[in-house]
A protein has these predicted regions:
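Acidic/aromatic-lined carbohydrate-recognition and catalytic surfaces
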Residues: 2-12, 24-280, 287
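Active-site groove signature of glycoside hydrolases
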Residues: 289-292
Length: 292
């Protein structure tokens, strides 16, 4: 090998070594950057919760005590607020921070919403997910899903007679499908909204079934009366929602010998928010859904 060939090969080897080193440096930089980025987006969950609670606790306690004056139920609520927050995904926690920094995010003039029943629009939740590119093309960035939770067939009032607040109507999908849709929406800069029915439950709800069996704990979650005295007083001032199809605001239950308040349809029993257990449990249902 002559000197020229040796020099040429040496230069080639040095160039290859530099290229390999550069590639390694780039790879290392990308790895470090990815680690930093991952750390940056993982929120300090306990610290964030503690700060928010410290800021709001006095107002929250005052409002709760004005309504119920029950320390133990308030303590339970605070504990559950923390538990549900810890169960939120990092993606949702970061979305919380983003919205907290821009409290008027939902008032922007580019907010364009669309409301629909899932089955009428796309068949099921996965169908809605498949249509997101089309909706995004239409500049829709807020999806308002009409009631989709589990309801008794034939007695659903369009989905407003909820039998289970933690179960999607089977023909529409599952909670896993809902969480996947929410995640896909957020990744596309879209918001997901739902109707949360808090005034009443279906008579098929677990609470209503137990109340109908005479369980006092669950009867206290609704408005039960064994005669017409108080119902008649209500009827003097409470307007009727469906005066033609469902007249009156109370339904007689001959199997237990009581009237129950039903301001909508007879199969929708009004919840008694004078009972702190009702407020707490409905809030837990709300938080469960917000975590999807």
């Amino acid at each position: 090998m002559n000197q020229r060939e040796r020099k040429k090969r040496t230069v080639k080897a040095e160039t290859a070594a530099k290229t390999a080193l550069t590639a390694k440096e780039i790879k290392t930089e990308k790895t470090v950057s990815a680690v930093k980025e991952k750390k940056a987006v993982k929120p300090d969950t306990q610290g964030i919760f503690d700060n928010r609670m410290a800021e709001k606790i006095d107002e929250l306690r005052w409002l709760y005590m004005e309504l119920y004056g029950n320390d133990s139920m308030f303590a339970e609520l605070c504990g559950q607020l923390q538990a549900f927050y810890q169960e939120r995904t990092d993606a949702l926690k970061n979305l919380d921070l983003k919205r907290e920094a821009d409290p008027d995010w939902y008032k922007k003039n580019d907010m364009l919403g669309m409301m629909f029943y899932i089955d009428n629009f796309a068949g099921n939740i996965k169908g809605v997910s498949a249509k997101l590119p089309y909706l995004k093309e239409c500049n829709v960035n807020c999806l308002h899903l009409m009631p989709f939770l589990d309801t008794p067939k034939g007695r659903s009032d369009g989905g407003y007679a909820v039998a289970d607040f933690r179960k999607v109507r089977p023909d529409l999908g599952s909670m896993k499908d809902l969480a996947a849709l929410a995640d896909k929406c957020h990744k596309n800069g879209m918001n997901l909204c739902m109707d949360f029915v808090m005034n009443h439950t279906s008579e098929d709800h677990e609470w209503a079934r137990k109340a109908r069996q005479g369980d006092g704990e669950y009867m206290s979650r609704y408005f039960f009366y064994n005669n017409r005295e108080i119902p008649d007083e209500y009827e003097k001032t409470v307007p009727q929602v469906f005066p033609t199809t469902a007249p009156g605001n109370f339904t007689w239950l001959p199997d237990i010998g009581h009237y129950v308040m039903t301001t909508f349809y007879p199969y929708q029993w009004d919840l008694n928010y004078g009972n702190p257990r009702v407020f707490n449990e409905m809030m837990y249902n709300f938080l469960f859904l917000a975590n999807q």
